[in-house]
Amino acid sequence: MLEKIFPKIHSEGYKFLAIAIIVTIFLYVLSTFLGLIGLVLSIWVYYFFRDPERISINDENYLTSPADGEVLMVHEVDGPKELGLEDRKFTKISIFMNVFDCHVNRTPCEGKISEILYKPGKFLNASLDKASEDNERNYYKITNTHGEEIIVVQIAGLIARRIVCESSKDQQLQQGERIGMIRFGSRADVYFENYESLVKVGQKTIAGETLLAKK
């Protein structure tokens, strides 16, 4: 119960929370009002870097959301050319994470990471379609238990300035397992074949729990 009210924070947040607390103490010495502003800032930093436990369905016939946020797009596209998949058609679901969403990303399926590819880029608004090709991003190619390739892409946004990858090539993953995070506003794209989408544009998602697609 306590974990639900006060979830642990991601290790990426330790430094930011420490800085926020120090600033809060300094501001409180100057003024109670300023100290309260600092306290609100500290609470927001804690909230942003929260890393709650999630319970996945653990079913190979479903894909779960890789991110908390809102579904921006659901459409058929060519596969990412960066991974040599441009000659194949995939369903692509894009999920936008605003600064109030949990930014820890998770794998949508059980499987093995066959490739991780980082691409430097711009920091355009992550809600724009061209962010998929222009922004800083990190690709994960995951081979699921059916032998199919599921692609997850972390995309940095207008405010985000660091993509954190916590996984490695050939790592075996369980559905809903953490693979990384993005700091301060961003987006996650999922590419898949042979699954039927279960979500619609505007729908809210929870990483590791919301069902994105089914066989």
Swiss-Prot record:
Binds 1 pyruvoyl group covalently per subunit. The lineage of its organism: Bacteria, Pseudomonadati, Pseudomonadota, Alphaproteobacteria, Candidatus Pelagibacterales. This is Phosphatidylserine decarboxylase proenzyme. Pathway: Phospholipid metabolism; phosphatidylethanolamine biosynthesis; phosphatidylethanolamine from CDP-diacylglycerol: step 2/2. It comes from Pelagibacter ubique (strain HTCC1062). The active site is at S186 (schiff-base intermediate with substrate). Catalyzes the formation of phosphatidylethanolamine (PtdEtn) from phosphatidylserine (PtdSer). It is an enzyme of class 4 (lyase). PANTHER family: ARCHAETIDYLSERINE DECARBOXYLASE PROENZYME-RELATED. Heterodimer of a large membrane-associated beta subunit and a small pyruvoyl-containing alpha subunit. GO terms for cellular component: plasma membrane.
